[in-house]
Curated annotation (Swiss-Prot):
Modification note: May be ubiquitinated by NEDD4L; which would promote its endocytosis.
Positions of modified residues (Phosphoserine): S484, S485, S486, S1501
Gene of this entry: SCN3A
Subcellular location: Cell membrane; Basal cell membrane
Catalytic activity annotation: Na(+)(in) = Na(+)(out)
GO CC, alphabetical: basal plasma membrane; plasma membrane; sarcoplasm; voltage-gated sodium channel complex
III repeat ranges, renumbered to this chain: 1188-1499
Protein name, UniProt field: Sodium channel protein type 3 subunit alpha
Length: 2000
C-alpha cells in the first residue's frame, strides 16, 4: 500500500487523460483478460486488490501528492489509484483537491471523455460554486415549503427551483453518463432521489392527477438532498442504515412478542372497553315492563331487540344516545365500568351495559387484532399508557394488572432497550472500524517515513562519495535550499500561487537582509514573520521524533500532537493519522519528560486507565494548560523576566509557557539559551537538517534529498499555518497592543497583581462568590417585598463588581493576549461583559432575558467541580459527535413537519369540529409549520398517540398511522437511541476517571489543603501542649522502618504540597502517594520507579478517585490506638482493591462485615466493647477464665450458637414478613373491622417483643463492637427503636400525638429488614450502595444544570400563571370580560383569581415543574400556561406568547435527553466497576483463554443421555421414525402459526356465520394437535412424559378439549379458554434451534434468559420499594379529595389500590395526576371539614410538602435508578450474548454433538467403537463436522482407546473442540479441570485406562501390514521360481510374451489378499444412522479405499 502511494508523488504523478491513455487502458484490460482463463476470473473475487480508500471519489487528495499544477485543475487526468489501472476511468480534481472519478466510456453513447461539451459539463460539476448553488437552492426551497398558505407568485419560484434541479441533473448526466457504466448518474443512489424528485415535479405539472397535494409532499424529499451535498452526513446516514439493518432481528422479535401479547389482550379484553354506565330509563317507559328480557341475553349482537312483546320503547335508539351515559366533568368519553367484583362500579341509578363506541374516538380497544396490536405498541413505547391501564382495569377488573406488569417488564423494558442495545452496538462497531482504519493509516504513514529514511540514507551515501562541497551558510543559503526544493518538486502542501508569493517575499527579504544585517542582530524582535517560520523548523529525519523549540500561538496545542490527518479532508478530526512522538527538553522545564511509549494521539476511549497512573501523560485528548500553570506555577528558579518553561499537558504535549516577555517575536521564536548572535542559531538549525551538503552536488541525490526535505517541510508548514489562524499582521498588532510590558515599574505592578490573583485562596474566594451569587439568583420569587428585591439588586451589583474586578486584575496579570488564550477566561469575559451590558440596559423593556445570562456563572463551578466539568465535557464531546446526527435529526424533523403540514394541514382546518367542540384549532395541529414542528417534536419525546387520534379523526386512519409510525420508529426508536448510544460511549470510564483538566491539582484543593494543614498544625500543637501539661510520657506508637506504613492508604486527594511544588502529579490531577493514616510523611513515587509497585506486593496503590468526589476526606484519619489495630487495618487495606479510575469511592469494610464474610473457624463471640472503651473504662474488661466472667462467657457462647443457627434466621425472616404483612391491613376500613384491628394491635406488640429479644440476643452474642459496626444491624436497630417508641407511647396514652403518629408511619420501613436476609436483593442493594456516590454526584450535577433553567423559568414566568376562573363552571373567563386582577376581583364571589398548581413562582416550584416536563408527565398544562401567559396580574390569552414553546424544547433537549440519560450511563459504568472489583477471574484471562474457558464451561455442563429406544414393534417403529424427524416438528410449528392466524381473525362484532366458521376451524386444529399427542404417545410410550415440552403439549391439549365442552362454565369462573391456544406459541421457541437464519433472534432470547435471574432480583427490590411506599401512601394520602388522577379505583385507600397506583408511576406515568389532589392544601381547593363515614378522620386536604417528597423520591428511586439498573443488566447481557454467539462454539453445537452421539451410543455407555468414528464425525453439523474422507484427520488426532477399540466421548469432543479453536498451550490445564468437572457431574463415568491411541494403533497396523507384505513377496518369489521353470518349457513352444504374463500373475496374487480389507467393513457395523441407511455400503467402501492406500503410503514414508 505504502509503495503504491509513494511511487508517484510529485507533479509527474498527474498526467492528462488523452486518447492514448484510453487506448493504453484498453490494451491492459485486454492483456489481463487474455492472461486469465475464464474460471479463474470468477474465483478471484476474494483476493482481488481493493480500491485505495484514500483515493476514493469524494475524498480530498492526500497531500503527499503535493499540489495540482494549475493547468491540470478541472481537467481529466489519468487515475492515480493502481486498482483502476485497467478499468476505464479517469479522475478530475477541483481547486479544493477533491477527487471526482468518471467513467471513460462515452456518456449517452455520444460524448467521449475529450468531447468539449462533456469537458465543460465536468468543469461545472467539479466547481465548488456549483455545489454551493445547489445547496442554497435546496435551503431556499425548504423555506418556501414551510409556508402554509403560499402567495400566488410562489408558483414561479417553484418553476425556478425545478429548472435549477433539472439543470443540475443534466450537467451530471452529461458529465457522467446515464446509467450503464460505473460512476454514471444512476449508479449513485443519492441521484435516484434527485431523479424521482424531478420526475415528480414534471408529472404533477403536466398530468392532472387527483390528489396533487399528496404528490407535492414528495418535494419534501429535496431536503434529503442536503445529505448528499454535505460530506459528513453521508457517513452518519450510513451508520443509521447499518443500525437499521442490524435491527431486523429485534424488529422481528418485537413484532412477534407484540403479536403474542396482542392476541392475549384480544382474548382477555375483547369488547370490554365498550362497557358504559347507562342511566335507567324513566320508570314510566315500556322498558320497565320487560326488564327481564333485556338481561336474559335476548339482545342480538347489534343490540337491537329480538321479538319481545310489541312495545313503544326503542332500546337501540336509547343506548345510541350519548346523553344517557354517565360522563365525568371535563372528560370527553363516558365512564367505563365492568361487571366483575373488582371492576369499576356505576353510580346509583345507572347500569353497566356494552354499548356505543370505544374510548378516544373509538381508537383505543382490543376488539380486533389490529387495534389490540396498536394498544400493545403503545404500551411498549409507554405513551400515555396509564390511560389504557386505567380504562382496562376499570372495565375488566384489577386482577388484570398482572397482564400489564408482564407487558411492561418483558415487552416494554426489554424490547425497547434491546433496540437501544443493538443501536449502541452498531455504533460501537462503526467506531471501532474508523479507529482501526486510522491506525492502519498511521502504520502506512510510518512505513512511508521508513522508506523516506532509507532513500535519505542512500542519498547520503551517494553524496559522501562526491567530493566537492558548497559553502552553505546564512539564511540566504537556506532560502535557496528551500527554493530549489520547491522547483525540484512541486510537492508543497499549498497551491503554486502561494509559493510564488512566498518566493517574492523571500527575495525581498534577502535583499533587505543584506542591508539590515547589523540591525537584525541587535533587534531580534523585528525579524520578519515568514523567515522565522521557515527557520524555526528543526526536524531530525527520524521517523518517530521531531524536536522543535517552537512556541505556538496557542498554548494548548503544539507541534508534537499533529491533529491534522494526512489523508483525510477533516483537518481537526479526533483521530490523527499520524503522531509524532516528541521529546522536548527546555530551559526551565521542571522535569525531563520522555514518553515514547504512548502515541500522543491515542483516543482516550481506546485504552483503559493503567494502574500506574503516574507513569503516563498520554491520556486525554487536547486540554488546556491552566492559567495557573502559566504564571503562578513557575519553577522557583526562574526569574520573572519570562524565560520559557514547558508544561506537559495531558497528551504528553509540551507547550512552552512563559512569563510576559516570553514572546520574543510575533510567532514566539525563542533563541536557545546563551546564543547571542543569529548566526549560531542558524548553524544549529541547519545542522539539524542532517542532509549532508556534499550530496547536494550530485544532481539526482540533491533532487531526492530536497524532495524529502520538502515533503516534510511542507507537511510541517501546512500544519503550522493551519495553527496560525490569523494573517501575520494580526500577530504584529497583538504583539504591540495585547502584550503589555512597557516599563519596569509596570512589570513590578504586574508581578504583584499576578501573585495576588493567581493565589489559590483568591480562587477559593471567587468560587464562594459564585455559589453566593447563585443563591442570590435562586432567592427570587413571587410575590417579593420591595426590601427583599432591593437586597437582591444590591447583591447583584456587588457580585458583578467582584467578577469585573477579577477579570480586570487577571488581564493585568496575564496580558490580554494570554488571558484570552484560555477557554475559561474567554467564558468569564463574555459573562462579565453581558452582566455589564445588562446593568446598562436594565430599564429597557423586554430585555430582562439578559438577566438569564448571569446564570452561566454557575458553570464557572465546573472549574473546581470535576463531575460537573465531566458532564459539560460529555455534553461537549457528544455535541461534537452529535453534530452530524443532530443535522440528520433536524432534517428528519423538518421533512416530517412539512409532510404533515402538506398532507393534513387542510384537513385540520376543514374537519376541526370533529375534535374540538367550539370548532377552533386545537393546540396541537398541523395547519402551519411551527405547530407541525411541535407535533413532530412531541412524537420524538415519545408522545404520539394523542396527536395521532386527532389526526386520524380529521384526516383518515391510514395516512396518519403511516406518518406517525414512521416518525416514531425512525425518529424516536432509531435516531434518539443513537443519541443515547453516543452518550453512553462518551461515558466510557476514561472520561469518568480523567475528570481533571490538566495534570495540575486545581487551586481549590490547594487552598483547602492549606487550610486543612493549618488546622492540623494547630490541633497538633494544642495536643502537644495538653500532653506536656498532663502526661509526662506521651504514648506513641513506634512505627518501625516504615514497613507498616507501606500498606496504609494515602490521603485520597493528596493535600500535602510542599512550597517547592515537588509533589507528583498523576493523570487524574490528584497526587498519588503512600503515607500513614494522618502522618504528614509522603512517599513520592518516582516515575521510573513504578516497577516497585509490582515487585512489592505489600504496597497498595491507590488510584485516586475523581477528585472532588472524595470530599477531601482522609481515608483513615482515626488515630490508631494499638499495634494490633494497625496490623488489622493493614490487612483490611490489603484486602480492598481500590477502584481503578472509577467513580466508586473505596469503602473500607467494617469489622462487622468482615465477620460476615470470613468463615468462622470456631464459634467464639467477639469482644463486647471496642478497645477504646476498655482503655477508658477498664472495668468493662472481664476475665472469662473463672467465676462470673466464665458464666457470662458461656451465656454469650450459647446466645451465639442460637443466633447463628439457621432456624433462628428463618424464624426471624418469617416474623419480618408477617409484621410487614400486618401493615398492609391498616387501610381506611380498619375502623369498621374491629376484630382485625384488635388482632393487629396485639400482633404488633408481639412482633415488637420478638424483635427486641432478637436484638438483645445479638448484642450478647456479637458484642456491641460487631453489632454496631454492621450497617444492616444498624438498620434493624433503628427500626426496632421506632416500634419500641410507639409501643411506649401507646402504653402512656400519647398515641394521638402528632409526632408519635408520624413515627408510626416509619413502621413502613420494616420490610427493609428483609433486605439483608435475601441474598439476591442484598447483591442488588450492594451494587446500588456502591453506585450511590456517583448517582448522587450526577443528581447534584443535574440539579445545578436544572437550576439554570429553573431560575430562567422564574425570570420568565413568575406570577404570570395566575388566571381568573368562573367559580360555577370552572372555566376561564375570556379576555373581553376580564383583562386583569382588578377586573376579576370586581366580579366578587363568582370569580376567583387562581394560580396553576405547578408553576414557576420560585425556584423550588420551578424544579417540580421541570421534573414534570423532563418526565413528559403533566408537562402540557405547564406549557399551555407558559404559552398563554402575558404579564403579572394580567389574564392569559390563548397562545399569546407562542415562542415560549422553545424554552421547553431547549430544556427537553438538554435537561431531559442529556441529564436523565446520564443516569443510565453512570449506573452502567458503576456496574462494570463493581464487576471488575468482585468478579475478578475474567480480568486475568487472555482472550484466548477466555474462549477455551467458555467452551469448556459449556462442555462440562453437558453429558451424553440415553436416547429413547426405538420400539421393537414394527408399526410403532414406523411411527417413531416419522415422529422423530425434523420435518414433523417443523410442520407442527406451521400448524401452530396457522392456529394463531385464525385467532387473529376474530373480532368483537363478527357475524354468526363467521363465529361458526372459526369454531369449526378451531375444532380441526384441536383434532390435529390431539393427533400429534396420540402419535407421540404411541411411539414414545412412557418415555413421552420424560420430556418437558411434551408435558406442556399434553396439558394444552387436555385444556383445549375440556375448554371445548365446558366453554361457558370456564369463561364464567376463569379466563377464556382460547387463552390456552396462545400459550402454545411458546413452542415456537423450540423451532428456533432448527432454523439457521434465526441465530440473531436466538441471541436476543439468550440475552433475556441470561438477564432473568438479575432481573428477578431487581424486580424483588422494586417490589420492596413499592411495598414500603404503598404503606406510607396509605397512612398519608388515604383521604385526599378524589380529582385528577385519584378516583374510586386508583387511590391510596387500600393496599391493593396503592400498589396499582405505584406500579403505574414506576415508569413515571401519570404521577402528575396523582400528585395534583395532594397539592390541595386549603379551601376552596379542598374541604378541611369533610366527614368520612366509618372513620374518625376529617377533611380531604393533602399535604403538599409530604406529597412532593413522596412522589419525587419514588420517581428518582424507581424510574431513574431501579429501572435503569434493569436497562443496564439488559445492555450488559446483550453484549455478553452477542460475544457468545460470535464464539466459534456455542451451547447448541455441544447439544448437537450429544444428540448425534445418542444415535451412535444408544445405551449411553459414553464410549463409541473406533470403527464408527468416521461416520460419527461426518454426521455432525459444522463447526464440529469433519466431512469424509476423514480417516487421516481422525487418526492424526491421536485419540486414546480402551480395550475393545472404544473411544470415550470426552476425548472425541475435546479433540474436535481443539480442532475448531486451534492449538493452544492452555489446553492441557483446562482439560484436566474439565475432566474433573465431568467426573463430578457424571458419577457414572467409567474411570478408564487407555491402552493405546488411534495413531499408535494405525502405526501397529501399518507395521503389521508391511511385515505381511514383505513375507508375501518372499512367498511370491518362491512360487514364481517354481512356476517360471514350468512356463519356460511352454514358452518355447507357444511363444507367450513372458513379462506380460508375469505381471498378470502378480496382479492376480495381489488381488487375492488385500491386507486392509478388514478396515473396509467399518461402515456396515454402525447402527442405522441417517447417513448409513441412505448410502449403499459399496459406495462408501469405494470412497474410503484410495484414502486408505494414501494413508498407508504416508505412514510408511514416516517410518522410513
Amino acid at each position: 500500500m505504502a509503495q503504491a502511494l509513494l511511487v508517484p508523488p510529485g507533479p509527474e504523478s498527474f498526467r492528462l487523460f488523452t486518447r492514448e491513455s484510453l487506448a493504453a487502458i484498453e490494451k491492459r484490460a485486454a492483456e489481463e483478460k487474455a492472461k486469465k482463463p475464464k474460471k479463474e476470473q470468477d474465483n478471484d473475487d476474494e483476493n482481488k486488490p481493493k480500491p485505495n480508500s484514500d483515493l476514493e471519489a469524494g475524498k480530498n487528495l492526500p497531500f503527499i501528492y503535493g499540489d495540482i499544477p494549475p493547468e491540470m485543475v478541472s481537467e481529466p487526468l489519468e487515475d492515480l489509484d493502481p486498482y483502476y489501472i485497467n478499468k476505464k476511468t479517469f479522475i478530475v480534481m477541483n481547486k479544493g483537491k477533491a477527487i471526482f472519478r468518471f467513467s471513460a466510456t462515452s456518456a449517452l453513447y455520444i460524448l467521449t471523455p475529450l468531447n468539449p461539451v462533456r469537458k465543460i459539463a465536468i468543469k461545472i460539476l467539479v466547481h465548488s460554486l456549483f455545489s454551493m448553488l445547489i445547496m442554497c437552492t435546496i435551503l431556499t426551497n425548504c423555506v418556501f415549503m414551510t409556508l402554509s398558505n403560499p402567495p400566488d407568485w410562489t408558483k414561479n419560484v417553484e418553476y425556478t427551483f425545478t429548472g435549477i434541479y433539472t439543470f443540475e441533473s443534466l450537467i451530471k448526466i452529461l458529465a457522467r453518463g446515464f446509467c450503464l457504466e460505473d460512476f454514471t448518474f444512476l449508479r449513485d443512489p443519492w441521484n435516484w432521489l434527485d431523479f424521482s424528485v424531478i420526475v415528480m415535479a414534471y408529472v404533477t405539472e403536466f398530468v392532472s392527477l387527483g390528489n396533487v397535494s399528496a404528490l407535492r409532499t414528495f418535494r419534501v424529499l429535496r431536503a434529503l438532498k442536503t445529505i448528499s451535498v454535505i460530506p459528513g452526513l453521508k457517513t452518519i446516514v450510513g451508520a443509521l442504515i447499518q443500525s437499521v439493518k442490524k435491527l431486523s432481528d429485534v424488529m422481528i422479535l418485537t413484532v412477534f412478542c407484540l403479536s403474542v401479547f396482542a392476541l392475549i389482550g384480544l382474548q382477555l379484553f375483547m369488547g370490554n372497553l365498550r362497557n358504559k354506565c347507562l342511566q335507567w330509563p324513566p320508570s314510566d317507559s315500556a322498558f320497565e315492563t320487560n326488564t327481564t328480557s333485556y338481561f336474559n341475553g335476548t339482545m342480538d349482537s347489534n343490540g337491537t331487540f329480538v321479538n319481545v312483546t310489541m312495545s313503544t320503547f326503542n332500546w337501540k335508539d336509547y343506548i345510541g344516545d350519548d346523553s344517557h351515559f354517565y360522563v365525568l366533568d371535563g372528560q370527553k368519553d363516558p365512564l367505563l365500568c365492568g361487571n366483575g367484583s373488582d371492576a369499576g362500579q356505576c353510580p346509583e341509578g345507572y347500569i353497566c351495559v356494552k354499548a356505543g363506541r370505544n374510548p378516544n374516538y373509538g381508537y383505543t380497544s382490543f376488539d380486533t387484532f389490529s387495534w389490540a396490536f396498536l394498544s400493545l405498541f403503545r404500551l411498549m413505547t409507554q405513551d400515555y399508557w396509564e390511560n389504557l391501564y386505567q380504562l382496562t382495569l376499570r372495565a375488566a377488573g384489577k386482577t388484570y394488572m398482572i397482564f400489564f406488569v408482564l407487558v411492561i417488564f418483558l415487552g416494554s423494558f426489554y424490547l425497547v432497550n434491546l433496540i437501544l442495545a443493538v443501536v449502541a452496538m452498531a455504533y460501537e462497531e462503526q467506531n471501532q472500524a474508523t479507529l482501526e482504519e486510522a491506525e492502519q493509516k498511521e502504520a502506512e504513514f510510518q512505513q512511508m517515513l521508513e522508506q523516506l529514511k532509507k532513500q535519505q540514507e542512500e542519498a547520503q551515501a551517494v553524496a559522501a562519495a562526491s567530493a566537492a562541497s558548497r559553502d552553505f551558510s546564512g539564511i540566504g543559503g537556506l532560502g535557496e535550499l528551500l527554493e530549489s526544493s520547491s522547483e525540484a518538486s512541486k510537492l508543497s502542501s499549498k497551491s503554486a500561487k502561494e509559493w510564488r508569493n512566498r518566493r517574492k517575499k523571500r527575495r525581498q527579504r534577502e535583499h533587505l537582509e543584506g542591508n539590515n544585517k547589523g540591525e537584525r542582530d541587535s533587534f531580534p524582535k523585528s525579524e520578519s514573520e515568514d523567515s522565522v517560520k521557515r527557520s524555526s523548523f528543526l526536524f531530525s529525519m527520524d521517523g518517530n521524533r521531531l524536536t522543535s523549540d517552537k512556541k505556538f500561538c496557542s498554548p494548548h496545542q503544539s507541534l508534537l500532537s499533529i491533529r491534522g490527518s494526512l489523508f483525510s479532508p477533516r483537518r481537526n478530526s479526533k483521530t490523527s493519522i499520524f503522531s509524532f512522538r516528541g521529546r522536548a527538553k527546555d530551559v526551565g522545564s521542571e522535569n525531563d519528560f520522555a514518553d515514547d511509549e504512548h502515541s500522543t494521539f491515542e483516543d482516550s476511549e481506546s485504552r483503559r486507565d493503567s494502574l500506574f497512573v503516574p507513569h503516563r501523560h498520554g491520556e486525554r485528548r487536547n486540554s488546556n494548560v491552566s492559567q495557573a500553570s502559566m504564571s503562578s506555577r513557575m519553577v522557583p528558579g526562574l526569574p520573572a523576566n519570562g524565560k520559557m518553561h514547558s508544561t506537559v499537558d495531558c497528551n504528553g504535549v509540551v507547550s512552552l509557557v512563559g512569563g510576559p516577555s516570553a514572546l520574543t517575536s510575533p510567532t514566539g521564536q525563542l533563541p536557545p539559551e546563551g546564543t547571542t548572535t543569529e548566526t549560531e542559531v542558524r548553524k544549529r538549525r541547519l545542522s539539524s537538517y542532517q542532509i549532508s551538503m556534499e550530496m547536494l552536488e550530485d544532481s539526482s541525490g540533491r533532487q531526492r534529498a530536497v524532495s524529502i526535505a520538502s515533503i516534510l517541510t511542507n507537511t510541517m508548514e501546512e500544519l503550522e499555518e493551519s495553527r496560525q489562524k490569523c494573517p501575520p499582521c494580526w500577530y504584529r498588532f497583538a504583539n504591540v497592543f495585547l502584550i503589555w510590558d512597557c516599563c519596569d515599574a509596570w512589570l513590578k505592578v504586574k508581578h504583584l497583581v499576578n501573585l495576588i490573583v493567581m493565589d489559590p485562596f483568591v480562587d477559593l474566594a471567587i468560587t464562594i462568590c459564585i455559589v453566593l451569587n447563585t443563591l442570590f439568583m435562586a432567592m427570587e420569587h413571587y410575590p417579593m417585598t420591595e426590601q427583599f428585591s432591593s437586597v437582591l439588586t444590591v447583591g447583584n451589583l456587588v457580585f458583578t463588581g467582584i467578577f469585573t474586578a477579577e477579570m480586570v486584575l487577571k488581564i493585568i496579570a496575564m496580558d490580554p493576549y494570554y488571558y484570552f488564550q484560555e477557554g475559561w477566561n474567554i467564558f468569564d469575559g463574555i459573562i462579565v461583559s453581558l452582566s455589564l451590558m445588562e446593568l446598562g440596559l436594565s430599564n429597557v423593556e423586554g430585555l430582562s432575558v439578559l438577566r438569564s445570562f448571569r446564570l452561566l456563572r454557575v458553570f464557572k463551578l465546573a472549574k473546581s467541580w470535576p463531575t460537573l466539568n465531566m458532564l459539560i465535557k460529555i455534553i461537549g464531546n457528544s455535541v461534537g459527535a452529535l453534530g452530524n446526527l443532530t443535522l440528520v435529526l433536524a432534517i428528519i424533523v423538518f421533512i416530517f413537519a412539512v409532510v404533515g403540514m402538506q398532507l393534513f394541514g387542510k384537513s385540520y382546518k376543514e374537519c376541526v369540529c370533529k375534535i374540538n367542540d367550539d370548532c377552533t384549532l386545537p393546540r396541537w395541529h398541523m395547519n402551519d409549520f411551527f405547530h407541525s414542528f411541535l407535533i413532530v417534536f412531541r412524537v420524538l419525546c415519545g408522545e404520539w398517540i394523542e396527536t395521532m387520534w386527532d389526526c386520524m379523526e380529521v384526516a383518515g386512519q391510514t395516512m396518519c398511522l403511516i406518518v406517525f409510525m414512521l416518525v416514531m420508529v425512525i425518529g424516536n426508536l432509531v435516531v434518539l437511541n443513537l443519541f443515547l448510544a453516543l452518550l453512553l460511549s462518551s461515558f466510557s470510564s476514561d472520561n469518568l476517571a480523567a475528570t481533571d483538566d490538566d495534570n495540575e491539582m486545581n487551586n481549590l484543593q490547594i487552598a483547602v489543603g492549606r487550610m486543612q494543614k493549618g488546622i492540623d498544625y494547630v490541633k497538633n500543637k494544642m495536643r502537644e501542649c495538653f500532653q506536656k501539661a498532663f502526661f509526662r510520657k506521651p504514648k506513641v506508637i513506634e512505627i518501625h522502618e516504615g514497613n507498616k506504613i507501606d500498606s496504609c492508604m494515602s490521603n485520597n486527594t493528596g493535600i500535602e504540597i510542599s512550597k517547592e511544588l515537588n509533589y507528583l502529579r498523576d493523570g487524574n490531577g490528584t497526587t498519588s502517594g503512600v503515607g500513614t493514616g494522618s502522618s504528614v510523611e509522603k512517599y513520592v513515587i518516582d516515575e521510573n520507579d513504578y516497577m516497585s509497585f509490582i515487585n512489592n506486593p505489600s504496597l497498595t496503590v491507590t488510584v485516586p478517585i475523581a477528585v472532588g468526589e472524595s470530599d477531601f476526606e482522609n481515608l483513615n484519619t482515626e488515630e490508631f490506638s494499638s499495634e494490633s489495630e494497625l496490623e488489622e487495618s493493614k490487612e483490611k487495606l490489603n484486602a480492598t482493591s481500590s477502584s481503578e479510575g472509577s467513580t466508586v469511592d473505596v469503602v473500607l469494610p467494617r469489622e462487622g462485615e468482615q465477620a460476615e464474610t470470613e468463615p468462622e473457624e470456631d464459634l467464639k463471640p467477639e469482644a463486647c466493647f471496642t478497645e477504646g472503651c476498655i482503655k477508658k473504662f477498664p472495668f468493662c474488661q472481664v476475665s472469662t477464665e473463672e467465676g462470673k466472667g466464665k458464666i457470662w462467657w458461656n451465656l454469650r457462647k450459647t446466645c451465639y450458637s442460637i443466633v447463628e443457627h439457621n432456624w433462628f434466621e428463618t424464624f426471624i425472616v418469617f416474623m419480618i414478613l408477617l409484621s410487614s404483612g400486618a401493615l398492609a391491613f391498616e387501610d381506611i376500613y380498619i375502623e369498621q373491622r374491629k376484630t382485625i384491628k384488635t388482632m393487629l394491635e396485639y400482633a404488633d406488640k408481639v412482633f415488637t417483643y420478638i424483635f427486641i429479644l432478637e436484638m438483645l440476643l445479638k448484642w450478647v452474642a456479637y458484642g456491641f463492637q460487631t453489632y454496631f459496626t454492621n450497617a444492616w444491624c444498624w438498620l434493624d436497630f433503628l427500626i426496632v427503636d421506632v416500634s419500641l417508641v410507639s409501643l411506649v407511647a401507646n402504653a402512656l396514652g400519647y398515641s394521638e400525638l402528632g409526632a408519635i403518629k408520624s413515627l408510626r408511619t416509619l413502621r413502613a420501613l420494616r420490610p427493609l429488614r428483609a433486605l439483608s436476609r435475601f441474598e439476591g436483593m442484598r447483591v442488588v442493594v450492594n451494587a446500588l450502595v456502591g453506585a450511590i456516590p456517583s448517582i448522587m454526584n450526577v443528581l447534584l450535577v443535574c440539579l445545578i444544570f436544572w437550576l439554570i433553567f429553573s431560575i430562567m423559568g422564574v425570570n420568565l414566568f413568575a406570577g404570570k400563571f395566575y388566571h381568573c376562573v368562573n367559580m360555577t363552571t370552572g372555566n376561564m373567563f375570556d379576555i373581553s370580560d376580564v383583562n386583569n386582577l382588578s377586573d376579576c376581583q370586581a366580579l366578587g364571589k363568582q370569580a376567583r383569581w387562581k394560580n396553576v398548581k405547578v408553576n414557576f413562582d420560585n425556584v423550588g416550584a420551578g424544579y417540580l415543574a421541570l421534573l414534570q416536563v423532563a418526565t413528559f408527565k403533566g408537562w402540557m398544562d405547564i406549557m399551555y400556561a407558559a404559552v398563554d401567559s402575558r404579564d403579572v396580574k394580567l389574564q392569559p390569552v390563548y397562545e399569546e406568547n407562542l415562542y415560549m414553546y422553545l424554552y421547553f424544547v431547549i430544556f427537553i433537549i438538554f435537561g431531559s435527553f442529556f441529564t436523565l440519560n446520564l443516569f443510565i450511563g453512570v449506573i452502567i459504568d458503576n456496574f462494570n466497576q463493581q464487576k471488575k472489583k468482585f468478579g475478578g477471574q475474567d480480568i486475568f484471562m487472555t482472550e484466548e483463554q477466555k474462549k477455551y474457558y467458555n467452551a469448556m464451561k459449556k462442555l462440562g455442563s453437558k453429558k451424553p443421555q440415553k436416547p429413547i429406544p426405538r420400539p421393537a414393534n414394527k408399526f410403532q417403529g414406523m411411527v417413531f421414525d416419522f415422529v422423530t424427524r425434523q420435518v414433523f416438528d417443523i410442520s407442527i410449528m406451521i400448524l401452530i402459526c396457522l392456529n394463531m392466524v385464525t385467532m387473529m381473525v376474530e373480532t368483537d362484532d363478527q357475524g354468526k356465520y363467521m363465529t361458526l366458521v372459526l369454531s369449526r376451524i378451531n375444532l380441526v386444529f384441536i383434532v390435529l394437535f390431539t393427533g400429534e399427542f396420540v402419535l407421540k404417545l404411541v411411539s414414545l410410550r412412557h418415555y413421552y412424559f420424560t420430556i418437558g415440552w411434551n408435558i406442556f403439549d399434553f396439558v394444552v391439549v387436555i385444556l383445549s378439549i375440556v375448554g371445548m365442552f365446558l366453554a361457558e362454565m370456564i369463561e364464567k369462573y376463569f379466563v377464556s379458554p382460547t387463552l390456552f391456544r396462545v400459550i402454545r406459541l411458546a413452542r415456537i421457541g423450540r423451532i428456533l434451534r432448527l432454523i439457521k437464519g434465526a441465530k440473531g433472534i436466538r441471541t436476543l432470547l439468550f440475552a433475556l434468559m441470561m438477564s432473568l435471574p438479575a432481573l428477578f432480583n431487581i424486580g424483588l427490590l422494586l417490589f420492596l420499594v413499592m411495598f414500603i411506599y404503598a404503606i406510607f401512601g396509605m397512612s398519608n394520602f388515604a383521604y385526599v379529595k378524589k380529582e385528577a388522577g385519584i378516583d374510586d379505583m386508583f387511590n391510596f385507600e387500600t393496599f391493593g389500590n396503592s400498589m396499582i397506583c405505584l406500579f403505574q408511576i414506576t415508569t413515571s406515568a401519570g404521577w402528575d395526576g396523582l400528585l395534583a389532589p395532594i397539592l390541595n392544601s386549603a379551601p376552596p381547593d379542598c374541604d378541611p371539614d369533610t366527614i368520612h363515614p366509618g372513620s374518625s378522620v376529617k377533611g380531604d386536604c393533602g399535604n403538599p410538602s409530604v406529597g412532593i417528597f413522596f412522589f419525587v423520591s419514588y420517581i428518582i428511586i424507581s424510574f431513574l435508578v431501579v429501572v435503569n439498573m434493569y436497562i443496564a443488566v439488559i445492555l450488559e447481557n446483550f453484549s455478553v450474548a452477542t460475544e457468545e454467539s460470535a464464539e466459534p462454539l456455542s451451547e447448541d453445537d455441544f447439544e448437537m454433538f450429544y444428540e448425534v452421539w445418542e444415535k451412535f451410543d444408544p445405551d449411553a455407555t459414553q464410549f463409541i467403537e473406533f470403527s464408527k468414528l468416521s461416520d460419527f464425525a461426518a454426521a455432525l453439523d459444522p463447526p464440529l463436522l469433519i466431512a469424509k474422507p476423514n480417516k487421516v484427520q481422525l487418526i492424526a488426532m491421536d485419540l486414546p482407546m480402551v480395550s475393545g477399540d472404544r473411544i470415550h466421548c470426552l476425548d472425541i469432543l475435546f479433540a474436535f473442540t481443539k480442532r475448531v479453536l486451534g492449538e493452544s498451550g492452555e489446553m492441557d490445564a483446562l482439560r484436566i479441570q474439565m475432566e474433573d468437572r465431568f467426573m463430578a457431574s457424571n458419577p457414572s463415568k467409567v474411570s478408564y485406562e487407555p491402552i493405546t491411541t488411534t495413531l499408535k494403533r494405525k502405526q501397529e497396523e501399518v507395521s503389521a501390514a508391511i511385515i505381511q507384505r514383505n513375507f508375501r513377496c518372499y512367498l511370491l518369489k518362491q512360487r514364481l521360481k517354481n512356476i517360471s521353470s514350468n512356463y519356460n518349457k511352454e514358452a518355447i513352444k507357444g511363444r507367450i510374451d513372458l513379462p506380460i504374463k508375469q505381471d498378470m500373475i502378480i496382479d492376480k496374487l495381489n488381488g487375492n489378499s488385500t491386507p486392509e480389507k478388514t478396515d473396509g467393513s467399518s461402515s456396515t457395523t454402525s447402527p442405522p444412522s441417517y447417513d448409513s441407511v441412505t448410502k449403499p455400503d459399496k459406495e462408501k467402501f469405494e470412497k474410503d479405499k484410495p484414502e486408505k492406500e494414501s494413508k498407508g503410503k504416508e505412514v510408511r514414508e514416516n517410518q522410513k
